[in-house]
């Protein structure tokens, strides 16, 4: 089994905020780390990259009178550093749409779709002041569906509807603010209508696709898919490969989706293997996972599979598109201009990155929009991490040290009570329950099952009271309790690893069990810490956030924000 894990490509015109992070990159990383333990590192590939073409970058470059690539070079390296070095995202390949391999692949792939591509004249807004056509974000106006007054020419950020510039009410040029005129210009259209029935059949027959993705895709095909322009009049983009389209570029969404393929090709080309990429894209023994925000569902559940079908090359279609709803910040939408939210270069200055990872997965908006609050953050860190997980690990291993000099005691399987059997049963069953939820893209739900297990373990330890067993000389019961407890700690470490890899490794070091990255997920279900094994030194695993953390956060964030702003690249300020 080959497992392809992808995260929606972050657009480089701004630093991602916490909502962006949980919507794609972090969720994908948690799943990729799980998948490597479950399927083996050699069978899992995790890719993404910087999405850097299109109108927002071109507009910014025009305003600053610089080449767009000057801006995206800086932004790509900044984001890449944050993901790989600060947040420790475990990409196998984090690339960019300016990659020569990507640009070459996109042009070659689109030429395979010519059977489904039509040329037609389209009316596009044109700014007579700036002497520019205004595709997509070059034009803004009022959304015809919800009345939002700052809708873009390609999509309304308020209601999520995909738009064309001609649909906007009272359109204005994004550069100078003047009202454009509409001019006819030739464009190339991908005829999605040819795939209406195929998309419906594919999405309806899937037993793994989440309901929110199915609903959006079926709504689209229910309304009838229509041809969509695949070219733009932008200069900043991949040149269109079609005959007569020399002055056109490829619409950013069509080319960015193909980055999932080109990133795999690039990864193996760097390793000197020109053919191995096909193992992740062709054949039945593949599972593919796409982690995205809900506003990207139409592109991944309709346009991407339609392009793959149109190539007539038997590309593997998406298995699970895990699309989150929106994460709010203290009840409001994230907003850079209004300074509402926390961005990923600010967050590590406020709290340990792995605390953030755990908190964000606990708040992951899987079924509905969820609300990030500092109060809930403090509760999660202080109660769930410190009190529930950290204290349990510390208590069990400290008692193994205290009562048995760090040697895991012998286990009498024929002398067990119902409470012992219950925890052993949970050790056997919980990893599968968590794994099954992860496989469905339900990371928050899987983490809740892990915490239920931790709470049961705490209740077991409190009920057994090993300190009393020791005092009363109940040696066999004490040994069984601490043997089971030590094995439950190992289970917790493996379940925690995808969310908090460094802290899971710390638990493994306390257990003296080597590198957890080399462990197998199934080991979490076993009693594999054997009697006679010598555990390591026991250390404090987590630290509580101080009582005044919440009350001081606003001032602290303001100071950090001023410092961070000074080091951000030009495009991201």
Curated annotation (Swiss-Prot):
State if Zinc is listed as a keyword: yes
Q: Indicate the enzyme's highest-level EC class.
A: ligase
Q: At which positions is motif 'KMSKS' region?
A: 333-337
Give yes or no: UniProt keyword Metal-binding.
Answer: yes
Record EC number? 6.1.1.10
UniProt GO MF annotations: ATP binding; metal ion binding; methionine-tRNA ligase activity
Name the UniProt record assigns to this protein: Methionine--tRNA ligase
Q: Which gene encodes it?
A: metG
């Amino acid at each position: 089994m080959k497992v392809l894990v992808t995260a929606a490509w972050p657009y480089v015109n701004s630093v991602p905020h916490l909502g962006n992070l949980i919507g794609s990159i972090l969720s994908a990383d948690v799943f990729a780390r799980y998948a490597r333990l479950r399927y083996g590192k050699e069978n899992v590939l995790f890719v993404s990259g910087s999405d850097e073409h299109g109108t927002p970058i071109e507009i910014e470059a025009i305003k600053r009178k610089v080449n767009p690539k000057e801006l995206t070079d800086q932004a790509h390296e900044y984001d890449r550093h944050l993901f790989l070095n600060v947040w420790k995202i475990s990409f196998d390949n984090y690339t960019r749409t300016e990659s020569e391999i990507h640009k070459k692949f996109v042009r070659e792939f689109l030429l395979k779709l010519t059977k489904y591509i039509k040329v037609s004249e389209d009316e596009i807004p044109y700014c007579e002041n700036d002497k520019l056509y205004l595709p997509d974000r070059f034009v803004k106006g009022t959304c015809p569906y919800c009345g939002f007054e700052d809708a873009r020419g390609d999509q309304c950020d308020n209601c999520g509807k995909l738009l064309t510039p001609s649909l906007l009410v009272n359109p204005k040029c994004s550069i100078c603010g003047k009202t454009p005129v509409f001019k006819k210009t030739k464009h190339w259209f991908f005829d999605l209508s040819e795939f209406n029935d195929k998309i419906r059949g594919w999405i309806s027959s899937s037993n793994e696709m989440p309901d929110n993705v199915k609903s959006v895709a079926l709504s689209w095909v229910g309304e009838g898919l229509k041809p969509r322009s695949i070219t733009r009049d932008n200069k900043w983009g991949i040149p269109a490969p079609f005959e007569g389209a020399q002055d056109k570029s490829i619409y950013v969404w069509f080319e960015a989706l193909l980055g999932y393929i080109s990133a795999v090709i690039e990864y193996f080309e760097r390793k000197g293997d020109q053919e191995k990429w096909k193992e992740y894209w062709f054949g039945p023994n593949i599972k593919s996972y796409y982690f995205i925000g809900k506003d990207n569902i139409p592109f991944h559940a309709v346009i991407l599979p339609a392009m793959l079908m149109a190539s007539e090359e038997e590309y593997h279609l998406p298995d699970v598109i895990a699309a989150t709803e929106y994460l709010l910040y203290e009840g409001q939408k994230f907003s850079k201009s209004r300074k509402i939210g926390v961005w990923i270069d600010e967050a590590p200055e406020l709290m340990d990155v792995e605390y953030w990872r755990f908190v964000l997965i606990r708040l992951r908006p899987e079924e509905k929009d969820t609300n990030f609050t500092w109060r809930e953050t403090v509760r999660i860190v202080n109660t769930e991490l410190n009190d529930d997980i950290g204290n349990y690990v510390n208590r069990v291993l400290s008692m193994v040290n205290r009562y048995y000099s760090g040697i895991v005691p012998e286990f009498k399987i024929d002398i067990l009570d119902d409470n012992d059997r219950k925890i052993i049963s949970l050790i056997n069953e919980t990893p599968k329950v968590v794994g099954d939820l992860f496989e469905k893209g339900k990371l928050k739900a899987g983490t809740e099952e892990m915490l239920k297990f931790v709470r049961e373990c705490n209740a077991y330890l409190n009920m057994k009271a090993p300190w009393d067993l020791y005092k009363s000389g109940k040696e066999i019961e004490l040994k069984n309790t601490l043997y089971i407890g030590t094995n439950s700690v190992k289970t917790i470490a493996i379940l925690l690893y995808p969310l908090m890899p460094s802290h899971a490794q710390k638990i493994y070091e306390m257990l003296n069990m080597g590198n957890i990255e080399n462990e197998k997920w199934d080991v979490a279900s076993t009693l594999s810490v054997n009697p006679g094994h010598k555990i390591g030194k026991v250390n404090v695993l987590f630290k509580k956030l101080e009582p005044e953390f919440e009350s001081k956060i606003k001032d602290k964030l303001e100071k950090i924000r001023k410092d961070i702003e000074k080091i951000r690249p030009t495009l991201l300020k």
